[in-house]
Design a protein with these regions (language model features):
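Bacterial N-terminal signal peptides
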Residues: 4-12
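Extracellular, repeat-based ectodomains that mediate carbohydrate processing or recognition
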Residues: 17-393
Length: 393
C-alpha cells in the first residue's frame, strides 16, 4: 500500500519545465580542415533574430584571407540560406543586431576601421576615422548604438556612437569617447546594452590599474558618460600570493534584462588555481551593479571556463552560457538566473558529448525562444558552425 501511494504521488507531481531543443543545423556551407571559422566578437553578438528570421555572422579564411560572412534562415525554412560576404579586405570579429521585420545591422573591423551595414539592401558605412577594432552593436526600439576600441595616442580607448537609420541608409548621429582624456593604458573589448528608455550601458576591459579589470559606464543619450566604475569587486593589489597588480578578469558581456535591468557576465581569475570562472553582476535599474556572483555550479570547480556570454529579455529571463571541458572535452553549458542565484549548469544537448563544442553565442527572441550558435570542431573534416533553437516547456 505504501509503495502504491508513493507511485501515485510521483505520477501526480507536475513535470518540471525545461528547454526543448530543435535538431541542430549547420550554418556554414563551406568547410575543410584548412578553413577556420571564428565566432569571437566583442560582447559575443554573433546571432540575432528579427521578425521570424535568424541571422548568424562569423569570420573564416576560405578565400585565403580572413573575411566576414552572414547567413540567414527564415523560421519556415529547413536550412540556412547560402551565406553572403560582408567584407572586401581582411575582416575580423563581426557582430549583428536585429532591427525588426527581418532586417539587421551588422558591424565588423576591416582595414583597421570599424564598419557597419544594414541588411538586406544597405550600403557599408565607415564608423571610425581613426584605427579601430572590436566593434559591437546594441539596439532597442528606436535607439541603436555601436562601440569600438579606437587608437588614441599610444593606447586604445572606448568610443560609443549613436546610429540613426532612414530607410536603408545608416549614419552616425553622435560619436563620443567614454572618457575625454587619452587613456593611460589599453582599453578594449567593449560590450553594450540598451534599455527601453534609450539609455546605454557600456562595459570594457581596462588596464589602467596595470591588470585587466572590467569597467562600466552609462549614458542617457550617448552624449555624456558617467565616471567609469569597476564591475569586479576585487580590489587592485589583491592578487593571490602578492603576485602582480591584481587578479585578472576579461571579456565583459552585457544584456538588457527585465523592465530596466542590465546584467553583466565576464571571465574572472580570482581563483587563480582553477583558471577563469564565470562571474556576473546585476543592475536592477539603479545604474549601479551589485555584488559579484559566481555563475557555474560546483561541478565546474577546478575547471577553466571560456567564452562566457549573457542573454536576457524584457520578461525577466536571464541566462549565462559558456564552454568548459568538465566531462573531458569542451561542451557548451548554460545556467539560468532564478531571482536569487544561478541554477544548476545544463549542457546544451547538441553542443555536448564527443568532440569539441565551444564558443557559444546566443539570443532570446520576442517570444522567449533561445537561439544558440557554436563551433563544432573536427580536425579532419573541418569546423561546422552549428545552430539550435529551444523553447521553454
Amino acid at each position: 500500500m505504501r509503495a502504491a501511494a508513493l507511485l501515485l504521488a510521483l505520477l501526480a507531481w507536475p513535470a518540471q519545465a525545461a528547454w526543448e531543443w530543435s535538431a541542430p543545423l549547420t550554418v556554414n556551407s563551406v568547410r575543410s580542415a584548412a578553413i577556420f571559422p571564428h565566432l569571437e566578437s566583442a560582447n559575443h553578438r554573433g546571432v540575432a533574430v528579427s521578425g521570424d528570421t535568424v541571422a548568424v555572422v562569423w569570420e573564416d579564411n576560405r578565400d585565403g584571407s580572413p573575411q566576414c560572412y552572414l547567413a540567414t534562415k527564415p523560421a519556415a525554412a529547413a536550412a540556412f540560406q547560402p551565406e553572403i560576404r560582408l567584407s572586401q579586405g581582411d575582416c575580423y570579429e563581426p557582430v549583428v543586431a536585429a532591427l525588426g521585420e527581418g532586417r539587421f545591422v551588422a558591424a565588423w573591423e576591416e582595414a583597421g576601421r570599424a564598419h557597419a551595414r544594414v541588411l538586406p539592401g544597405g550600403k557599408v558605412l565607415k564608423l571610425s576615422d581613426a584605427e579601430a577594432a572590436q566593434v559591437t552593436l546594441a539596439a532597442a526600439g528606436e535607439r541603436m548604438y555601436a562601440a569600438w576600441a579606437e587608437q588614441a595616442g599610444r593606447f586604445r580607448r572606448i568610443v560609443v556612437a549613436r546610429l540613426t537609420l532612414e530607410g536603408d541608409a545608416l549614419s552616425v548621429k553622435t560619436r563620443r569617447p567614454v572618457e575625454a582624456k587619452k587613456p593611460a593604458d589599453e582599453q578594449g573589448w567593449p560590450a553594450l546594452a540598451v534599455k527601453g528608455d534609450g539609455s546605454v550601458t557600456v562595459a570594457w576591459e581596462d588596464r589602467r590599474d596595470h591588470h585587466t579589470v572590467p569597467m562600466v559606464s552609462y549614458s542617457r543619450d550617448g552624449r555624456r558618460f558617467a565616471r567609469p566604475a569597476r564591475l569586479t569587486d576585487q580590489a587592485s593589489g589583491a592578487s593571490p600570493e602578492g603576485l602582480g597588480a591584481g587578479t585578472g578578469a576579461m571579456r565583459p558581456t552585457l544584456a538588457a534584462w527585465g523592465e530596466q535591468g542590465i546584467a553583466a557576465v565576464w571571465l574572472d581569475k580570482r581563483d587563480f588555481l582553477s583558471g577563469y570562472d564565470v562571474y556576473a553582476a546585476l543592475d536592477g535599474g539603479t545604474r549601479r551593479f551589485g555584488e559579484n556572483i559566481r555563475v557555474q555550479d560546483s561541478f565546474g570547480d577546478n575547471m577553466v571556463q571560456w567564452h562566457a556570454t549573457v542573454v536576457g529579455d524584457a520578461g525577466g529571463r536571464l541566462l549565462a552560457l559558456w564552454d568548459d571541458a568538465r566531462d573531458g572535452t569542451p561542451d557548451v553549458w548554460l545556467s539560468e538566473w532564478d531571482g536569487k542565484a544561478f541554477g544548476d549548469d545544463v549542457a546544451v544537448p547538441a553542443a555536448s558529448g564527443p568532440g569539441a563544442q565551444s564558443d557559444p553565442v546566443a539570443t532570446l527572441d520576442a517570444a522567449g525562444s533561445l537561439h544558440v550558435v557554436w563551433l563544432d570542431r573536427d580536425e579532419a573534416a573541418g569546423t561546422r558552425i552549428r545552430y539550435a533553437r529551444a523553447e521553454w516547456r
